Amino acid sequence: GSNGMGKTTLMKTIMGLIDAREGKITFKNEDITNSSPDYRSKSGIGYVPQGREIFSTLTVEQNIMLPIYTRKKFSFSPQDKLEEIYSLFPILKEKRYVDGSSLSGGQQQQLAIARALIFDPEIIILDEPAEGIQPSIVKFIGNILSNLSKNSKKTFIVVEQNISLISQLNSDCILLEKGILTKKLKSSEINTVEKARDLLSLHN
């Protein structure tokens, strides 16, 4: 959808950052409509907000591990998970001891995704992950999401207007207009800028 159509509001509502005014949110056969964001996170929902929102004074590794510090029990080894994440994002391992503020926009986006992955969530919400990032990094992130979706059975809910990223994801797309779902289609159907403008009302 174009700007102001309710995409970010929907993502924040799913995550529990905004209260739902009507309807119900169900995850793993459980009604989580009134559950806290922390409960939803513990249940297996990760969130990468628009604008990344990393902690600029913490190191890259501290940013990634921050969610771990808030938990006491794990069904996995946090250190093993960290190494797995570093294998996905080598630049983060290279810069693991530098402050988040020193990273480029594309590196910060990788960091935000890595932070969401550290708890091995089943669903990850990403709000405009390609915003303000150079095309090569957009392609890299698209490959990561596509591979994780195929190989680890994770579900990604992605808000995006970047056509190149959408085309990398073999997924269902929905069009939102003022909070209403008006169309459902495959990402392969949005394969040109012209088509996207027709469907999503995008403009230069």
Language model region names:
Residues 99-103:
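Conserved ABC ATPase signature
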Residues 116-117:
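ABC ATPase C-loop
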